[in-house]
């Protein structure tokens, strides 16, 4: 794809329209790399569940959850690590769910007393066997980190376009543009979009719409402006 086409794609995205010059993506319900949609749905649901496990609430405002899985061990996959957006916890603006998960995986894989005990060189190679599931499309920073790591697969639920439509401030560069521009990197990554978006979307639709129901296990605060764990 020529640079002019990349520019047209990005410009069209600014107006909330996916450009026709972008390459088509595979149907998310297909069996890709020997992994069924049912299996992918299970891992995407775990990315949602990571919110409650790691953030302490099933309805954090920044409800971005990630799991990293090894499908080369078995088609069903082996969980390596999880991560959630930690901006509010750490104050670090780069602590997005994907970055937190990659950091957690690196620590787990190199832990000298852990299961894997890999060297730094071995970890770099290990990422090429792993799949990253995130319940919302990665920002350009995280999509770039995914490509630098060389993940075998990158799977997301809710799209950036959907987030923007529902009030979220986003850098309007879709992951497919990052992937198209990263062909010089040594390891290819397969991108799968909109997996289980019908279940990931509700985690991002209540923050700017007081009339939208809170996620399961949460209820509106008295002001109606936010959601909290438990019943009202």
Regions found by a protein language model. Give the residues of each.
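Zinc-dependent deaminase
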Residues: 2-3, 7-11, 16-55, 116, ...
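Residues at secondary-structure transition points
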Residues: 38, 89-96
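Short loop/turn motifs at secondary-structure junctions and domain boundaries
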Residues: 56-60
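Short beta-strand scaffold segments in enzyme catalytic cores
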Residues: 63-72
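Short, glycine-anchored, charge-dense loop/turn motifs used at functional sites
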Residues: 71-80
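Short beta->alpha transition motifs characteristic of CBS
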Residues: 80-87
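Short HxH-centered metal-ligating active-site micro-motif
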Residues: 93-142
């Amino acid at each position: 794809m020529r640079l002019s086409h990349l520019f047209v794609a990005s410009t069209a995205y600014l107006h909330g329209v996916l450009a026709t010059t972008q390459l088509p993506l595979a149907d998310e319900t297909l069996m890709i790399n020997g992994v069924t949609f049912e299996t992918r749905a299970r891992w995407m649901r775990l990315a949602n569940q990571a919110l409650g496990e790691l953030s302490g609430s099933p309805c954090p405002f920044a409800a971005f959850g990630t799991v990293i899985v090894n499908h080369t061990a078995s088609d069903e996959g082996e969980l390596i690590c999880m991560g959630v957006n930690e901006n509010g916890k750490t104050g670090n603006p780069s602590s997005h769910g994907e970055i937190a998960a990659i950091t957690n995986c690196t620590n787990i894989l190199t832990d000298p007393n852990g299961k894997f005990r890999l060297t730094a060189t071995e970890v770099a190679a290990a990422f090429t066997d792993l799949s990253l599931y995130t319940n919302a499309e990665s920002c350009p920073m995280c999509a770039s980190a995914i490509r630098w790591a060389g993940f075998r697969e990158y799977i997301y639920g809710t799209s950036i376009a959907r987030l923007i439509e529902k009030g979220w401030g986003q850098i309007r560069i879709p992951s497919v543009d990052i992937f198209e521009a990263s062909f010089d990197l040594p390891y290819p990554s397969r991108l799968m979009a909109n997996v289980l978006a019908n279940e990931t979307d509700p985690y991002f639709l209540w923050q700017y719409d007081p009339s939208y129901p809170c996620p399961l296990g949460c209820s509106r605060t008295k002001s109606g402006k936010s959601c909290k764990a438990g019943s009202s």
